[in-house]
Regions:
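A polyanion-binding, active-site-adjacent surface
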Residues: 2-196
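Generic C-terminal helix-cap and adjacent flexible tail
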Residues: 190-208
């Protein structure tokens, strides 16, 4: 049962959202995760095809890599009482013809993000995963390259932790930038562990 009627109405509105439907090859299927008790917020780009099919955020190889970066098992990662997950867009955008996915639809984040984040008052750390999330929440970083932005990761703490997207497309970048694994990931793991070790409220509304 949802304790806050306003929260329940927001969830219903999101699940019924079709504002991008004419542009979505598989139709609208908004995917978000989290409870208002969540301490860690992960904001990425948009669901991939496998996530669309399974309705489970980061249920793919990108998710495997992200969980490795965070040193989290699946049980902890998918604990909605502690971890909330949003995309810049909530629905799968389709393929781009070059082996990757199309960009997230631009209508989604302005329509829903502020409303959802208002119901996540316990968030202590927000991961901005990939260029679309970074550009949306840190527009001042444009037009810097991904490498330049990630090199400045300390500048955005303690609120935001910037990361490249963990997709296969980032493999060459990771090989070319070994400092990410040796300098950034240990700090990421330490901060995530500290945030997730905090006690969770005993009573939480229904998941988002």
């Amino acid at each position: 049962m949802i304790a806050d009627p306003a929260f329940g109405r927001l969830l219903a509105d999101i699940r019924a959202c079709t504002i991008c439907a004419p542009h979505l090859p598989l139709g609208a299927r908004p995917i978000v995760r989290g409870w208002p008790s969540a301490r860690l917020l992960i904001i990425s780009q948009a669901p991939g095809r496998q996530v669309h099919d399974t309705r489970l955020s980061f249920n793919d190889r990108s998710g495997d890599r992200l969980r490795t970066w965070l040193a989290l098992d699946r049980e902890t990662f998918y604990d909605e009482a502690r971890v909330a997950i949003l995309g810049v867009a909530f629905c799968y955008p389709g393929r781009d013809g070059k082996g990757g996915d199309l960009p997230p639809r631009p209508e989604c984040a302005p329509r829903w993000h502020a409303q959802l984040r208002a119901f996540l008052p316990a968030i202590e750390l927000t991961l901005l995963v990939g260029s679309y999330a970074i550009d949306y929440y840190l527009p001042q970083t444009r037009p810097r390259s991904m490498t330049e932005v990630i090199l400045r990761w300390r500048d955005f703490l303690p609120e935001f932790f910037v990361l490249p997207h963990p997709s296969w497309r980032s493999t060459l970048w990771l090989r070319a930038n070994p400092w990410f694994e040796t300098e950034v990931l240990p700090e990421l793991r330490e901060r995530a562990a500290a945030v997730l070790s905090a006690p969770v409220a005993s009573a939480s509304p229904a998941p988002i």
